[in-house]
Amino acid sequence: DAQESRGLGDVYKRQDIVFEGFGGVLCVEAGGPTPGIGCAGRGIISAFEKLEELKAFEIYKPDIVIYDVLGDVVCGGFAMPIRGGYAREVFIVSSGEMMALYAANNIAQAIKNFGRRGYARLKGIILNAKNIENEQELVAKAAAEIETEVVMYVPRSGDIQTAENQGGTVSEFVQASPMVKIYQELADKVLEMSEDTKGDE
């Protein structure tokens, strides 16, 4: 990570932390502290502060911004995209495993608390399948308990690992995979459910 090889007081340029991937997608990896030292949540806060300092949003003008944040630790830093007003909608990605659903419930409770203050809203659960028994039923039940819905079912596929081993996405390296269409459908659904995009239609 960049913060591992440099001191926090060193000067960064945008190109040091913003990388362009397949299809013009820009990616920023927040990184984290040395294991056992420091707070990963604080690293996320620092990343937002640095992006603002470098005026990354104003310069790149992204159409859509997605924050991929760990859900099993709901601390102040990990909630930064919500508390800071950066995110309007939250989609929880979960399998049907017990601990994943437990984390999903915690996230839902945190979002509910933030919602009372006018922050982001929970839009639903994206089921990232692990092929466990009765998985769709388990996740549908969990979604109902937190008063939301299953937005989409994403099946487990070895094509994902095949693409990852080549350092890319299925859209780039396994174009014949049915997962390409599934991810396109998921993207369309997320766009359709996102308030910020409705005024641009």
Spans of features found by a protein language model:
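Single conserved hydrophobic/aromatic residue that forms the stacking wall/gate
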Residues: 1-12
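Switch I (G2) and immediately adjacent beta-strands of P-loop GTPase domains
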Residues: 13-32
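Residue-level signature of catalytic and energy-coupling elements of molecular machines
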Residues: 28, 47, 68, 104, ...
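Flexible beta-alpha connector loops of hexameric P-loop NTPases
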Residues: 32-42
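Glycine-rich oxoanion-binding loops at beta->alpha junctions
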Residues: 42-46, 50
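Conserved catalytic-core segment of NTP-binding enzymes
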Residues: 53-64, 69-153, 162
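C-terminal boundary of histidine-terminating zinc-finger modules
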Residues: 166-177
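Short, hydrophobic alpha-helical segments
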Residues: 187-198
